[in-house]
Amino acid sequence: MITKAAKNATRKKRHARVRAKLTGTAERPRLNVYRSNQHIYAQVIDDVNGVTLVSASTLDKDLALNGTSNTEAATKVGESVAKRAVEKGVKEVVFDRGGYLYHGRVKALAEAAREAGLQF
């Protein structure tokens, strides 16, 4: 009998492997991405102090995402999190894709964050 592991379980294993080697500091925090079926979330995290410096998601009221596609929404979230991070004085981050493939919504968010001023 063929048993196939659930996609989310394999993603969590992949994320745990990467997180063992990847940490964010105050000088270079971690840009974490979480993707659900309907929304996408991004946080800039200082792992040394255990503090979220900046966050943005498709649930934010100020983004006005009515009627946009998922990749367009991810692009706006990437721009928003980058602008907020630059305002807080963060210019360089470590990108943590959360175990997701660098494709689609995750890629759109990352490229928008780069264009808005974050370096990674």
Swiss-Prot record:
Gene3D superfamilies: 3.30.420.100. InterPro entries: Ribosomal_uL18_bac-type, Ribosomal_uL18_bac/euk. CDD domains: Ribosomal_L18_L5e. The keyword rRNA-binding applies. One of its GO terms (cellular component) is cytosolic large ribosomal subunit. One of its GO terms (molecular function) is structural constituent of ribosome. Keywords: Ribonucleoprotein, Ribosomal protein, RNA-binding, rRNA-binding. Residues 9-20 have a biased composition (Basic residues). GO terms for biological process: translation. Residues 1-24 are annotated as: Disordered. Belongs to the universal ribosomal protein uL18 family. This is one of the proteins that bind and probably mediate the attachment of the 5S RNA into the large ribosomal subunit, where it forms part of the central protuberance. Part of the 50S ribosomal subunit; part of the 5S rRNA/L5/L18/L25 subcomplex. Contacts the 5S and 23S rRNAs. This is Large ribosomal subunit protein uL18. It comes from Bacillus mycoides (strain KBAB4) (Bacillus weihenstephanensis).
